[in-house]
Design a protein with these regions (language model features):
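Short, solvent-exposed beta-strand-to-loop segments that form ligand-recognition rims
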Residues: 166, 189-209
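Short, aromatic/His-centered strand-loop micro-motif at the edge of beta-sheets
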Residues: 155-176
Length: 235
């Protein structure tokens, strides 16, 4: 009698394990409901022009904020194309900006790969997010000349430094900047290494974009955006 009861118990446990092995069923459900990723690789865009979904901001003196265009190059991270800022001149506070039309993101996971090409006054580039316009946004940027990574809050065209991280940046290879932002909490990664974890409550949502400064010429590639489900109330 005891043996039959034990056999029934074993069969019952086996049926549960087969139906939901090690909780993978739950993981699969989460994956199915994960927010989709929107990505710009620029590989199907026409070289020599700006992709139609992007627009160029305005510099402090009213001129277009850089010369942004798709380039065909064998230096692309994911060939054949990159999005490049090619204006190789500019004043100290000439911020070269391009933003994506029709995107309003609050909580997000955003990344881009960049390759520093040239620059004497400045070099490198960065990510813009939660942008109200081309003068109000968050910015994470990497500068090979200064050998650092910084995150800023930009208000009315003026940068306010939030944090600095000293980092060796090799100009001969591609690098990646990534930001996750939920509520006020932002985490920023450089080549998969976390460099910032901070809270700022200035901007709640907005556009995304790319950024360079002064005379920096930079290639950008593989720009993925994932809208994240909010776990915070607006603060």
């Amino acid at each position: 009698m005891a043996k039959r009861s034990m056999n029934r118990l074993v069969k019952s446990l086996l049926s549960v394990m087969i139906a939901a092995p090690l909780g993978f069923g739950t993981m699969e459900t989460q994956a199915e409901t994960a927010p989709p990723v929107q990505e710009w690789s620029f590989d199907h865009e026409q070289p020599g022009v700006l992709p139609s979904q992007f627009f160029i901001g305005t510099m402090f003196d009213g001129r277009p904020a850089g010369e942004w265009q798709v380039l065909a190059t064998d230096r692309a991270k994911s060939p054949p194309h990159v999005l490049a800022q090619v204006m190789a001149k500019g004043a100290e506070h000439a911020y070269k900006i391009t933003l994506v039309k029709g995107i309003v993101a609050a909580d997000l996971n955003l990344a881009v790969s960049f390759l520093p090409i040239q620059g004497q006054a400045d070099m490198g580039g960065g990510l813009i997010w939660r942008a109200a316009d081309d003068r109000n946004y968050y910015l994470a940027r990497a500068n090979p000349l200064e050998q650092n990574i910084r995150v800023y809050r930009v208000e009315n065209g003026i940068r306010h430094l939030l944090q600095n991280f000293n980092q060796t940046i090799d100009v001969r290879r591609w690098h990646t900047l990534r930001v996750t932002h939920q509520g006020c909490r932002m985490n920023i990664f450089y080549d998969d290494k976390q460099v910032f974890d901070l809270c700022d409550k200035s901007f709640h949502d907005g556009m995304i974009g790319l950024w360079t400064k002064s005379d920096a010429v930079t290639y950008f590639d593989d720009l993925p955006l994932q809208h994240m489900k909010s776990t915070h109330t607006r603060q």
